[in-house]
Amino acid sequence: MSTWGFASPTPDRFAVSAEAEDKVREQQTRLERIFNVGMSVLSKDCPENPHIWLQLEGPKENVCRAKEYLKGLCSPELQSEIHYPPRLHCIFLGAHGFFLDCLAWSTSAHLVPLLPGSLMISGLTEAFVMAQSRVEELVQRLSWDLQLQSCPGAPDNGGVLRDFSALLQTREDAYTEALLRLPLAVQEELLSLVQEASRGQGPSREVGSSGLLSPQFQGVRAPLNEGREFVGTRVAGSGKSPAVRGQSHTVEKEERKQDAVRDMGSGRKELSGEEVWEPGVAYRSQLAGGGAEEVAPLKGKASGKQEVPQQRGGFSVQGEPSGAHVPCQRAAPIRGASLLQRLHNGSASPPRVPSPPPAPEPPWPCGDRDRDRDRGDRGDKQQAGARGRGSPWKRGTRGGNLVTGTQRFQEALQDPFTLCLANVPGQPDLRHIVIDGSNVAMVHGLQHYFSSRGIALAVQYFWDRGHRDITVFVPQWRFSKDSKVRESHFLQKLYSLSLLSLTPSRVMDGKRISSYDDRFMVKLAEETDGIIVSNDQFRDLAEESDKWMAIIRERLLPFTFVGNLFMVPDDPLGRNGPTLDEFLKKPVRKQGSSKTQQPSKGSTEQANQQQGKDADRSNGGIRKTRETERLRRQLLEVFWGQDHKVDFILQREPYCRDINQLSEALLSLNF
């Protein structure tokens, strides 16, 4: 199959049940579009063979994803109908199914939209769980507080709105306006989904406009729904190739300027500060003509805004001379490194696209803050006598240059980093380091990605200080395919060096069941007299025993990241506490004057137990009923079905509150 535009490696052949042949043939076109592979059903050697052979050709990653998709389609391990707010239904049907294709590429699950608010998911266990998690993430983002995000002072509004609107330009359909009305948090997650697909060779190649993709992705065949097709950079239906459009660019530009001036001078609706933008009207498709259409007049009214006068012909804004505006402000260049510019790490910047409308002016205090900021900005750019609020188009253009957290994280990953642990002896007087891998990875990933590089940076830091006893705890399911994990090869290397330990987890009925990894960390710190590296406070574990409370209070080391720089405080316990070097060293134990007088191991353990009992009696006396019930529940979680033994130990040790000592006492019983 040579129609896919890339050199195909050795074809991958595998067998599936013959009963699923009809399903496979029905999904063949969609599978080839989503995963950008070629698929063929090989002829049967024997008509009675219960299996059929399928052949996939394409890039290795695409073939692996498509193979997992087909296996889940033919023999699904999990299948369920999930429900979500109907407002999100436009995601799965809008943009000609583009976001649904990106979700299928990311998870390799078979997705079928049903009635508004329901989605059928089927596939292998891992694919099903990933798809369910992505939908839950969209639902969670929909419930976020959106009032602050509508403020023009919010840092990411302009970039996210502009990129999302530009993404929909060549995919307009009946759901475009509903997509544009989604909260910015949901739009940002969809952009992240598209970016994830673009790192491979997934559905993001179906962009029909050359202005949204880098040159290396232009010229790729990209079929759309209902037979509509874009080939290369030529827009179907426009009748113009890029060369023709380039020759007529000057003429069209002059015509658009004249039309804009004529429209502004005609009897259009008065423009006032009370009016807000209608989302989705300002971004119309370029399929029909090749040039950006004019921005539609403003609709709707808000309360509490001062009216801005309009002057016929000259179109002046209050407080500014009529000559201060260009006749048409609808097309603004993209000056920042936006998310869509960097989708495929292209070397060339995209051409100009329409600038998004400004966000509606919020009530106090956002309005006053923006008004003060605009005065300061205009003081550097306009005449000294110019007062007032300034042009809303100019504010929208300036807001479009703001970066997003996802973009900043991707830029940080561009800097090369290699985990290099020198094979030299360490310092024996240093404490064991216990690293909260999930906490470190999420902090470095800006709470959005699981950054394996963050864990590697932390290990490198302590290794360079001379520590050799280092343990990183990470849930086992992070080793499986997870869209949020970045640079997982660092985890593989640390695991091969016995520096990383996996806490148990499993999947049951499509839900992930994980062990509480915080317990592993505190328990290991207790046994090794180690330091826990985490920004978590472990409040729920501090009440379980006095020893654990002392560990959490005295042996917890917080951290932070400045880009790719891992940093810890020089005074972990405050200004009056020990320095970092003293904090990381093992405590010095005083030895007796004669080694022959050292007690035996058995007598030492008995003395320690007796001291613990005496301490319990002196600290709190006999346990309260509530404490006993709590300890009984915790013990039964471990010693299931041994109610009589648990009750016996609790009655025999009325002063003990340490769950570990009670567990040891249970294990020592012989009946």
Curated annotation (Swiss-Prot):
Provide the residue span(s) of the region labelled Disordered: 234-274, 294-327, 344-402, 577-626
* Compositionally biased residues, Polar residues: 591-612
Ranges of residues in domain RNase NYN: 430-582
**Pfam families linked to this entry:** KH_N4BP1_1st (PF23050), KH_N4BP1_2nd (PF23052), RNase_Zc3h12a (PF11977), UBA_N4BP1_C (PF23054)
Modified sites of kind Phosphoserine: 355
- Compositional bias, Pro residues, is annotated for 351-365
Quote the Gene3D superfamilies the UniProt record gives. 3.40.50.11980
User: For bias kind Basic and acidic residues, which ranges apply?
Assistant: 250-272, 367-381
The record's keywords, sorted A to Z, are: Phosphoprotein
Q: Which PANTHER family match?
A: N4BP1-RELATED (PTHR12876), PROTEIN KHNYN (PTHR12876:SF28)
Family label: Belongs to the N4BP1 family.
Q: What is this protein called?
A: Protein KHNYN
